[in-house]
């Protein structure tokens, strides 16, 4: 498998993840039996993963990645408060989104580009 194909698959799966995140943020979900405020952990992890796996060809700096991922989280939280989706705006969810985006962006940059290239090379060899 060529490196361009691997990168294209990465972008495709990342875009599918973001689309699922958007839909999941706007569609009402009833979760019973979960501890109170446990959704903050889910928000944090969802946005950390989105920022961490941000396609490197679109990445300019950890700050721009944080602003875009965190901005999407804020926009979706605002949308929950404005749109008639049965969801409501929660500032703590917005904070968890932003913190997760920041941690994911910084973690992605801490993990060097060469490490990412080595991962793609190993994936390409296996394919």
Annotated model-derived regions:
Residues 1-94, 98, 102-127:
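Bulky hydrophobic segments
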């Amino acid at each position: 498998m060529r490196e361009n194909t691997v990168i294209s698959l990465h972008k495709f799966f990342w875009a599918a993840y973001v689309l699922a995140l958007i839909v999941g943020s706007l569609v009402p979900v009833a979760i019973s039996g979960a501890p109170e405020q446990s959704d903050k952990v889910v928000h944090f992890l969802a946005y950390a993963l989105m920022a961490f796996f941000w396609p490197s060809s679109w990445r300019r700096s950890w700050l721009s990645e944080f602003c875009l991922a965190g901005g999407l989280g804020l926009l979706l939280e605002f949308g929950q408060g404005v749109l008639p989706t049965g969801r409501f705006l929660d500032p703590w969810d917005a904070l968890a989104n932003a913190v997760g985006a920041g941690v994911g962006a910084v973690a992605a940059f801490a993990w060097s580009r060469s490490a990412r290239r080595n991962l793609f090379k190993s994936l390409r060899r296996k394919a």
